[in-house]
Amino acid sequence: MSNNGSSPLVLWYNQLGMNDVDRVGGKNASLGEMITNLSGMGVSVPNGFATTADAFNQFLDQSGVNQRIYELLDKTDIDDVSQLAKAGAQIRQWIIDTPFQPALENAIRDAYAQLSSDDENASFAVRSSATAEDMPDASFAGQQETFLNVQGFDAVLVAVKHVFASLFNDRAISYRVHQGYDHRGVALSAGVQRMVRSDLASSGVMFSIDTESGFDQVVFITSAWGLGEMVVQGAVNPDEFYVHKPTLAAGRPAIVRRTMGSKKIRMVYAATQEHGKQVKIEDMPQEQRDIFSLTNEEVQELAKQAVQIEQHYGRPMDIEWAKDGHTGKLFIVQARPETVRSRGQVMERYTLHAQGKIIAEGRAIGHRIGAGTVKVIHDIGEMNRIEPGDVLVTDMTDPDWEPIMKKAAAIVTNRGGRTCHAAIIARELGIPAVVGCGDATERMKDGEKVTVSCAEGDTGYVYADMLDFSVKSSSVDTMPELPLKVMMNVGNPDRAFDFACLPNEGVGLARLEFIINRMIGVHPRALLEFDDQDAALQNDIREMMKGFDSPREFYVGRLTEGIATLGAAFYPKRVIVRLSDFKSNEYANLVGGERYEPHEENPMLGFRGAGRYVAESFRDCFALECEAVKRVRNDMGLTNVEIMIPFVRTVDQAKAVIEELARQGLKRGENGLKIIMMCEIPSNALLAEQFLEYFDGFSIGSNDMTQLALGLDRDSGVVSELFDERNDAVKALLSMAIRAAKKQGKYVGICGQGPSDHEDFAAWLMEEGIDSLSLNPDTVVQTWLSLAELKK
């Protein structure tokens, strides 16, 4: 390539590797590294070239502009937003007005001619790559510019000049000062890369780790129609996919969860080559919003590439990808170290102690809670209105906003997904953010007090008023040994990756009710008899089941995703999934449910559990649950998932439900399947040995056992003070159940509320020889440590 003396001014990507970060910056070095080392492993990266740091430094030196720049920066107060804006604009104009040295212009001309020799109409992406960018402990995400659909040599030259100027964007200047980088020690490289025609297909961002929890056994992929800049900027709410790495490696279906984004707009090529106007934004037709922007096969192919890249770099990675609309081929266009989760941190657990009126909801970023005064900011000119501790509410945050984002107690946006700039910066700053709310700027009013909670799963909520919350920190590397296993009760798959990072020995109770309620929301019979519903109900259901081929597939598919997420999060530890235990009033509350459920005076003691599964009126609904379990265990290979049957009243019912499961293809012992019974009715303990003939063990439900042993309605405030699992009658029944299971060499655990609430009860169960305690996640560490103290 062209030289100036001994140092090249331009280098091809295939000449570069990670040893060249100081010459071409992290972004360009990484592209070169992948082309050189991973192209034989199925990772496709479009070719290109990069100007070097030497070229940039010579450009500043030979023109003398560098002295003016550093003198101006030295006397600028970076924390004064208006002073910073004025200095930044002046510096960028100086750079744009300075001509390139002839040697650099000729070097770019030669490289451009080679890169476009096969297609004179080829379009290019011109990106910045700072020499301090994408170091693992500093996210320079988006602080320099990217220009897309740049065609022709003159347009490329203009774009490179603007990329050089972008080293002195306001946000980049501010970031360097706050991170302790010297302006003189940072240079810029411009990367010129052939464009992938994702304007005709889809593109997005993926991480080889879950960005919220740090769980490293999944790849998290976001995708939307058109050029990827919309996803990166947070201008669009993208589709989201989680892929389980061990299942992928086994060659099985590995997508554990899919969430459809609204994808209202896309960025495409514009007809003009006027600088900065080469792309345009257009609305998406409704039919494309209502389908996923990637097929399942493409999602898995991208995940494989992410795993290859992660294995090569030996660390979690943040990767931008694009699909070519002409060929259908998937390309990697950027890869950098994931910068927030890979730092490691003390475990923090935020808990909200009150519920308020929900004003807005969207995607939760992080797991924290923040509260403060709302400031609705419509454009960057209003930045000076934000005071420390305010809640910043806006349509979407451009990276230019970073200087004020760090002042906020929380951030709320109308648009954006979990991989947009607002999300990346919020994570880095440790500020809770709720993105993609749709209409937060209309619902939230300037000056009102709110609480922003990201501590309740994937969905973040904005509540009216300043609500009470607490935070617990714990740094537990190794837990003491106990004579029993400490497991967890988990219902919400959204929290599974987060909870899996706590000390645990699996899941003793995974409830299907949460999945049915929150991820489906429709009565199974209303879906099976979809054609019989009235037009209004059919429309409601169609809206809920977008992305699925049929009402039946919606129910089975969503159940499969929920169970698979729980199974994958704790794999290979056992995850005991209790099949549905809704009462008739709870089923009636589902969409379309009232038509199919009896009205019962006391649903707690009515049509529920095993009796429902074998009833003619529910058998085909139960078959949907069985189908989901089979997919998770047999197709995906998550055989750590076991099933639990609730509320088995009689031994005859036990026999009938085991026969029904076998009829549905879930036979005890087949493919290692274990079937556990909830021991929660006095008859279960009194006839424990007979019940155990049909099951592989017991899981004690102390809540129902207490209410039925003492004749209490646990939902009645009048008698609630008598409700206590530690009552001698209850303990006598539990002892019988534990002894019977021990005698037969079968598993016995407990998943009721008791051990989470009462450490003395947990200690008594340990003395009785129970195999496991399944606790609420927030009590796991404390109960584990206190039981270890007792054993000393």
Q: What does each model-identified segment do?
A:
Residues 1-191, 200, 286-297, 302-304, ...:
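N-terminal beta-alpha lobe that positions the nucleotide/phosphoryl donor
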Residues 66, 326, 338-343, 347, ...:
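Acidic, glycine-rich flexible loop/linker segments
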Residues 112, 120-125, 130-140, 144-148, ...:
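Conserved alpha/beta-domain cores
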Residues 138, 148-150, 159-160, 202-211, ...:
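Beta-strand scaffold of nucleotide-dependent catalytic cores
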Residues 142, 314-339:
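Conserved metal-phosphate-binding beta-hairpin within the catalytic cores
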Residues 214, 450, 704:
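Small/polar (Gly/Ser/Thr/Ala-rich) solvent-exposed segments
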Residues 218-318, 323-324, 363-370, 388, ...:
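Conserved catalytic alpha/beta cores of large enzymes that bind or transform nucleotide phosphates
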